[in-house]
């Protein structure tokens, strides 16, 4: 009888210990440094896509701001807020190379599309976004698809915007978003605005070339001038 009771106690301890170990392992996996860092990077990327620049800066402040990955997002956020020249020297950014990512990386092309869009280079923004979609193992993502629709609409390429809308319409979580964009496209169709055109070819491998072309297109481009200064 005592052996039987001892066995029951051991089984009870095991049944309690195993879930606790599983919870502990799960907490470690979620809150370990590599995973926290990845979550912060994804958060910065998402906030930048949504143009929530204060949240971009706030997230970077809670991370390692000396990490080179954050510097392009940091400078873009400061530039979009119009405070880049005044605030940049408060951060450990020491090279002009830190304003841009290599174009042959998925994360790089995704950011570079935001960078080009901020400079007013819409076609280059679309080109970089297409590059990001082509490099992604999952193909089109919802966030990049939404940007394609908005940017094509702004560029006046409404038929292509509608094609991307047709793709997004197959999802089940964008009904309200699609309704709003459909109304926007319908209003755009009633105007006679010409599609946006860039009459130059851009070497997107160099941010300085992008900045130079942006200033050539508009010598009062404050965002491009702030980057150069």
Predicted regions and their residues:
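Membrane-embedded alpha-helical segments of integral membrane proteins
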Residues: 1-7
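Internal/C-terminal transmembrane anchor helices
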Residues: 9-35
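Soluble catalytic regions of membrane-associated enzymes that act on cell-envelope
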Residues: 30-200, 204, 208, 214-228
């Amino acid at each position: 009888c005592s052996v039987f009771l001892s066995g029951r106690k051991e089984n009870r301890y095991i049944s309690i210990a195993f879930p606790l170990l599983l919870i502990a392992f799960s907490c470690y996996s979620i809150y370990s440094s590599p995973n926290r860092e990845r979550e912060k990077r994804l958060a910065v990327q998402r906030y930048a896509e949504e143009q929530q620049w204060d949240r971009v800066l706030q997230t970077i402040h809670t991370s390692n701001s000396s990490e080179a990955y954050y510097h392009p997002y940091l400078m873009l956020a400061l530039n979009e807020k119009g405070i880049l020249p005044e605030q940049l020297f408060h951060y450990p950014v020491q090279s002009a190379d830190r304003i841009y990512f290599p174009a042959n990386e998925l994360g790089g092309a995704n950011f570079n599309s935001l960078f080009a869009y901020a400079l007013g280079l819409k076609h280059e923004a679309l080109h970089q976004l297409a590059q990001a979609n082509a490099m992604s193992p999952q193909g089109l993502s919802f966030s990049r698809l939404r940007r394609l629709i908005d940017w094509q609409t702004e560029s006046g390429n409404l038929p292509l915007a509608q094609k991307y809308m047709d793709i997004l319409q197959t999802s089940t979580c964008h009904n309200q978003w699609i309704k709003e964009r459909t109304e926007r496209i319908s209003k755009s169709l009633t105007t006679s605005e010409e599609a946006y055109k860039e009459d130059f070819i851009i070497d997107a491998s160099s941010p300085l070339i992008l900045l130079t072309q942006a200033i050539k297109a508009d010598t009062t481009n404050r965002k491009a001038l702030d980057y150069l200064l």
